């Protein structure tokens, strides 16, 4: 222990317990070792990785689907290759959970989220939507993003089940 102490009730009065679950999962391996709660690292992992990289995918894409397409997803994907790559990691993620390699899963899921964010950054739906001729394309790109977001969220369900339950209840997903 390095002087980091807080009362569990105090934490629960101010923060979602799933943030702590996510943080601990990002630090847990299948070995027996102490985990130091570093509040700066905690804040960075939750804000940057969980919210900034993963949750933001859903937020970025849902905004377009909701506002510009009346909550209607495209009938087909634009980037099947990236979607298939996300799905192909399922067995490795399951195995990591079975082997209690939680931090390995967080790294893998975060790297997959990085790929999705890179795709969205390259396709620039916020620019493409300005041209009416690109509306169908933007709908497909955002459908890609939401589908991949839902898969990534599913991969995190053992760690943040309440958050994922809320995501699964969103009608456009």
Predicted regions and their residues:
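Catalytic adenosine-cofactor/nucleotide-binding cores of aminoacyl-tRNA synthetases and other
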Residues: 1-77
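N-terminal alpha-helical segment
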Residues: 4, 35, 85-90, 148
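Generic detector of short, locally flexible boundary/turn motifs and exposed helical patches
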Residues: 17-21, 81-82, 130-132
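Helix-rich, typically C-terminal accessory recognition domains appended to large enzymatic cores
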Residues: 42-77, 90-173
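Membrane-interface interhelical connector segments
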Residues: 78-86
